[in-house]
Regions:
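Non-cytosolic membrane-interface motifs at loop->transmembrane helix junctions
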Residues: 125-136
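Bulky hydrophobic segments
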Residues: 1-123, 142-156
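C-terminal or internal capping secondary-structure element at the end of a domain, subdomain, or sheet
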Residues: 134-144
């Protein structure tokens, strides 16, 4: 039974990684706009913490446009929700990642690498707020794992 559980967890993790690579990078291949890299970088990069989050919260508070409100919700919830599995699966697969600081540091490294690829390839946008929201998703996943795990030995 333990072997079946591990195979299932590895399969889920592999599928999750493949889906994330497609969503974050590969679905945008061939869709980058032609133009000067510096100009595109200016519009596709935010290195000011909380700038994007504040703008989405402002849209939710003040906009009467259902489309704009939906876009803000999808972006905020999506950036959090997409990374909940990263707070669940790695701690189940690697005991060393069951401690929150180690998990968050590992997740931050992975997310920063994805953001760097997006920055240099212009496949998507590089946004420090994505890193913050993604880490919030990892934290939420880890908390849910702790909440629903059976026994103290499942997750330290």
């Amino acid at each position: 039974m333990r072997r079946l559980r591990r195979v299932l967890l590895w399969t889920l993790f592999g599928l999750y990684c493949a889906l994330m690579l497609w969503l974050l990078l590969f679905r945008r291949l061939g869709r980058t706009m032609p133009g000067e890299y510096a100009a595109l970088l200016h519009t596709n990069c935010n290195l000011t913490p909380l700038r994007t989050i504040r703008s989405y919260l402002l849209v939710l508070r003040r906009s009467s446009s259902p489309t704009m409100r939906r876009y803000a919700v999808v972006n905020l919830a999506g950036n959090i929700g997409m990374f909940v599995p990263l707070g669940v699966l790695p701690p189940l697969l690697w005991p060393r990642l069951r401690r929150l600081p180690r998990l968050l540091l590992s997740a931050a490294a992975v997310i920063a690498a994805v953001e760097a690829v997006q920055l240099f390839t212009l496949l998507g946008s590089c946004d420090v707020d994505d890193l913050l929201l993604n880490l919030l998703g990892v934290l939420l996943g880890w908390g849910l794992l702790r909440l629903f795990s059976r026994g103290r030995d499942a997750v330290n």
